[in-house]
Amino acid sequence: MRRRRAEIRQVPPDPVYGDVLVAKLINKVMWDGKKTTAQKIVYGAFDIIREKTKKDPLEVFRQAVENVKPVLEVRPRRVGGATYQVPIEVQEPRRTSLALRWIVEAARARKGRPMKEKLAEEIIAAYNNTGTAIKKKEDTHRMAEANRAFAHYRW
């Protein structure tokens, strides 16, 4: 057990859009501390989004994240030798974090093109409520719905 609650670190906004959510996406895309590379990927993806949708990439991205955010998830809870998957509501910071993680994972799973293209396609897909990240959210909600009987084990 922690002596005190871990402090929530404030992420500084990104240099181009001045947006904290974009900065968080850059941090999720980043590997081995290579932030400049991650920024090139994200800003490149935003340029592709601008070309393909003819809309503001920031608005498309924000809506995509909103579409992917899960409302419920299941957490294991041990009760008398049995482990139940208990559905619980997801807190707002975790919703955002999961949405960004799922978008980046889905983009990485796409094969055969540069990362900026894959990321742009995944964000556009999420904006249109399709794609792997949306499927992941729906699977999570389906799991929560299937285990609704154990909701009274919440803590």
From Swiss-Prot:
N-terminal signal peptide: none
Protein name, entry field: Small ribosomal subunit protein uS7
Protein keywords: Ribonucleoprotein, Ribosomal protein, RNA-binding, rRNA-binding, tRNA-binding
NCBIfam families linked to this entry: rpsG_bact
Subunit architecture: Part of the 30S ribosomal subunit. Contacts proteins S9 and S11.
Functional note: One of the primary rRNA binding proteins, it binds directly to 16S rRNA where it nucleates assembly of the head domain of the 30S subunit. Is located at the subunit interface close to the decoding center, probably blocks exit of the E-site tRNA.
Family per similarity comment: Belongs to the universal ribosomal protein uS7 family.
GO cellular component annotations of the record: small ribosomal subunit
Gene Ontology biological process terms, A to Z: translation
Keyword Cytoplasm: no
Organism expressing this protein natively: Thermotoga petrophila (strain ATCC BAA-488 / DSM 13995 / JCM 10881 / RKU-1)
InterPro entries in alphabetical order: Ribosomal_uS7, Ribosomal_uS7_bac/org-type, Ribosomal_uS7_CS, Ribosomal_uS7_dom, Ribosomal_uS7_dom_sf
Any GO MF annotation of the entry: rRNA binding
Keyword Transmembrane: no
